[in-house]
């Protein structure tokens, strides 16, 4: 179904955004 594809895309985007945010936070903490 189309909504499943959309949901998967949203999940992937959220995962990447979360990783980016976590990486930025880790960089800030380590400085």
UniProtKB/Swiss-Prot annotation:
GO terms for biological process: defense response to bacterium. Coiled coil: none annotated. It comes from the Eukaryota. Keywords: Amphibian defense peptide, Antibiotic, Antimicrobial, Secreted. One of its GO terms (cellular component) is extracellular region. It is found in: Secreted. The keyword Hydrolase does not apply. InterPro entries: Dermaseptin_dom (IPR022731). Belongs to the frog skin active peptide (FSAP) family. Dermaseptin subfamily. This is Dermaseptin-DI3. It comes from Phyllomedusa distincta.
